[in-house]
């Protein structure tokens, strides 16, 4: 791979798990395939696309139809400095510790984000979103959106972002909100707050799901010394390949 090359994972047949993969410009992919006998085989052949992106896109042969018990789940180790784009059908997407911008979308699966060192765009139709965010990149315009699912978001006091939220369900938060009602619209409530400095923006949207915006507290040791750095490392530097 070349430095800065975008990694695209497009898996309509199952889940995608992405983790930080080190500092060398190389992608490592693991696949778990489940197939009944005598069905069209899901093929996996990573390749460079015409626009220079590195693409991991399993596909059935032309005319093949996915069977109910047939799926392929992917685990991808993403090197530092490479942006990641993920697409699934109803598959679950979780991204932990990736050090680049992340753009993910599922047609109906749940999304989990933790320790991402870049700007985030995440969208699902009917699934829920659970995320833990640290300081946003300066000037970033981040967005978490679902049509009907809940959004549960933990953030630091130094997020440094103007936060806009919208839903027709409930807001539950540790932060003070400026809430406005919009009767007859969907979503019918909007809320705004600023966490830290107003140096970026974060939009959180669900038409009908609850939005929970929680403060991530720093850890205090038994001796009374604050260990915020340790807590951040535990929450943000998630480099395992689970």
Task: Please state what every model-predicted region is.
Residues 1-242:
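Intrinsically disordered, low-complexity terminal regions
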